[in-house]
A protein has these predicted regions:
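Helix N-cap at the beta1-alpha1 junction of Rossmann-like dinucleotide-binding domains, i.e.
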Residues: 10-12, 152-154, 222
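Rossmann-like adenosine-cofactor binding region
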Residues: 169-239
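Conserved S-adenosyl-L-methionine
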Residues: 140-145, 234-236
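Short helix-loop-beta connector
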Residues: 115-121, 210-211
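Phosphate/diphosphate ligand-binding glycine-rich loop within oxidoreductases
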Residues: 1-114, 230
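Glycine-rich adenosine-cofactor-binding loop
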Residues: 7, 100, 110, 118-143, ...
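Short glycine-rich anion-binding loops that position phosphate/pyrophosphate groups of nucleotides
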Residues: 58, 62-67, 129-130, 193-196, ...
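Adenosine-phosphate binding glycine-rich loop
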Residues: 218-283
Length: 283
């Protein structure tokens, strides 16, 4: 099974490792390659997608900054990708099929930590591809209210309008409101690249969370970001992007696999994968 990852600044990605591990667990040979595009060249990106399909790839994962752009090249867009207007997984059959396992992966990550408890007021930092997936996932979890901090006001307002179509309440805030909103919310979710090895920093700037917060960071390289370190320092519940990484990869592998794998069967390996990746990455 030939798979790949297309994105920018992705040399530290663990995607090849986890898909090969899953292949070994289910006795499916996996060849997984990284295609690190150095520029946001949309034409080059589209050429790469069609080239990999022609080369017999089963599918590819898509990451920053192409999760929204990729929908232009899909023949079939699944329901969640259509709703979110973003995709992180392409399946190559006769058609190119767009799926979104960031959405399902966040749902599973949240439920892993909180069960059936509905999210209270939540601050989401960043409204790009993964931000769109997570805000819609929070909506599916019946979040009380979302506060979106997105510096691109046009992008932020488009997301809010899209959420309103599904009766998901969201307010766009600016930096001047950030400190006040942090004090009012229960959850803080980072969907920006800030904190990644190639984008150092903290999306909260100089502001600090408190021990009343739960904090999730979609960045997992490094696994313990500046944001999570801030949360750990004050005693907040911190949730590493490792969980999203694992759950979205499990869902993607099920979609890629040409043999039938029972979801319950793959779920048996969650604890093993969490223990391994937290040991390797969470330092």
């Amino acid at each position: 099974m030939k798979l790949g990852l297309i994105g920018k600044n992705i040399q530290s990605s663990q995607a090849p490792d986890i898909h090969k591990r899953l292949g070994n667990l289910f006795k499916i040979p996996v060849n997984y390659q990284i295609f690190d595009l150095k520029e946001n060249d949309k034409n080059y990106f589209s050429d790469q997608v069609f080239r990999l399909k022609d080369r017999g790839f089963t599918g590819v994962n898509i990451t920053f900054p192409f999760k929204e752009e990729v929908l232009k090249y899909a023949d079939v867009i699944n329901e969640s990708s259509l709703m979110i207007k973003s995709s992180n997984t392409l399946i190559f059959k006769t058609d190119i099929i767009a799926e979104n396992t960031d959405y399902t992966g966040f749902l599973r990550s949240y439920e892993f930590h909180f069960g059936k408890i509905k999210p209270k007021k939540t601050l989401v930092l960043g409204g790009g591809g993964v931000g769109r997936s997570i805000t819609f996932a929070l909506g599916s979890l019946e979040v009380e209210h979302i506060y979106l901090y997105e510096t691109d006001k046009v992008k932020g307002n488009i997301l809010i309008q899209d959420l309103e179509l599904f009766k998901i309440n969201c307010t766009l805030i600016d930096y001047n409101q950030l400190k006040k909103i942090i004090s009012e919310v229960h959850g803080i979710v980072n969907c920006t690249p800030l904190g990644h090895y190639d984008f150092p920093g903290c999306p909260l700037g100089e502001f600090m969370p408190s021990n009343d917060h739960w904090i999730f960071d979609a960045v997992y390289t490094p696994a313990k970001t500046t944001l999570l370190k801030k949360g750990e320092k004050v005693g907040a519940k911190i949730i590493s992007g490792i969980d999203l990484f694992i759950f979205q990869a499990l869902d993607a592998f099920l979609l890629f696999s040409t043999q039938r794998i029972d979801k319950n069967e793959i779920s048996k390996h969650i604890q093993f994968l969490r223990e391994y990746y937290f040991k390797v990455l969470f330092k």
